[in-house]
Amino acid sequence: GIDKGDYAVFKGIPYAKSPTGDLRFRPPQETEAWEGVRKAQEFSPKCTQRAKSSSFYEKEFYSEPQYQVPMSEDCLYLNIWTPAPSSIAPPLYPVAVWIHGGAFSSGYSSAISFDGEAYCKRGVLLVTINYRLGMWGFLTLPELAEENGDGTCGNVGLLDQIAAIRWVRENIAAFGGDPENITVFGQSAGSMSISV
């Protein structure tokens, strides 16, 4: 991660296996532990989407060059902003998980508008997540339903969100977060996801 003094940022942490090859259009699979130290200093690629967001989103959320990232199908990563430990801090910080908007077809977790510094200053740990978008996250085909065995397919973008929240619950204590005090919130498609 990156030590910012009052807080630390851990970028590009995988919460599921890469959804490529045989895992494309499939529910997210639990990631395997990695060997050694993961630096977690660079944002991951954003999930594959249209090359340019709508002018509103481009202007409001994704205009800062240092927060722009390449696209890739290998995109199931999250970012964590955590307050620095202090003698007056609670044993574990409350956790806020942010789900970005973008009409389920655009957006990403590392946009400047979703930076967690302000949350850390208030004693809240922030997590932002990527999830599959457009046809990569919501394609429904009879062939895919047949392969699943239960007759269902599609909505893997929503399953990605569930997998990310599950990862947070299982691992956030290692970053100073309270797994029993998690609030999920979002904007546009992100807030709609929470109500499903």
Which stretches of residues belong to each language-model region?
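Short, well-ordered amphipathic alpha-helical segments that serve as non-catalytic structural scaffolds
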Residues: 161-169
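Short glycine-enriched nucleophile-adjacent loop
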Residues: 191-196
